[in-house]
Amino acid sequence: MGMRMMFTVFLLVVLATAVLPVTLDRASDGRNAAANAKTPRLIAPFIRDYCCHRGPCMVWCG
């Protein structure tokens, strides 16, 4: 396999790995809308209950 062919294969692999996550993110947003909406409700109590009672994190808890 020549250098030009190896470079072409390398570019194809890089482009495929760069494009695939973008298309997967767009496709998953519609299907996981309920999960995405529920996430802030789950994170806020965790931060309040777990992190606000620890010394280093209390700065962020107001």
Swiss-Prot record:
* UniProt-annotated location(s): Secreted
Free-text tissue specificity from the UniProt record: Expressed by the venom duct.
Specify the propeptide location in this chain: 19-48
- Which spans of this chain does the record mark as coiled coil? none
What keywords are assigned to this protein? Acetylcholine receptor inhibiting toxin, Amidation, Disulfide bond, Ion channel impairing toxin, Neurotoxin, Postsynaptic neurotoxin, Secreted, Signal, Toxin
Is Endoplasmic reticulum one of the keywords UniProt gives this record?
A: no
| Xref: InterPro entries | Conotoxin_a-typ (IPR009958), Conotoxin_a-typ_CS (IPR018072)
What Pfam families does the database record attribute to this sequence? Toxin_8
User: What pairs make up the disulfide bonds?
Assistant: C51-C57, C52-C61
Q: Name one GO cellular component term.
A: host cell postsynaptic membrane
Positions modified as Cysteine amide?
A: C61
One GO MF term? ion channel regulator activity
Per the UniProt entry, the signal peptide is 1-18
In the record, the note on similarity to other proteins reads:
Belongs to the conotoxin A superfamily.
Q: What does the UniProt function comment say about this protein?
A: Alpha-conotoxins act on postsynaptic membranes, they bind to the nicotinic acetylcholine receptors (nAChR) and thus inhibit them.
Q: What is known of its domains?
A: The cysteine framework is I (CC-C-C). Alpha4/3 pattern.
Protein name in the entry: Alpha-conotoxin-like ImIIA
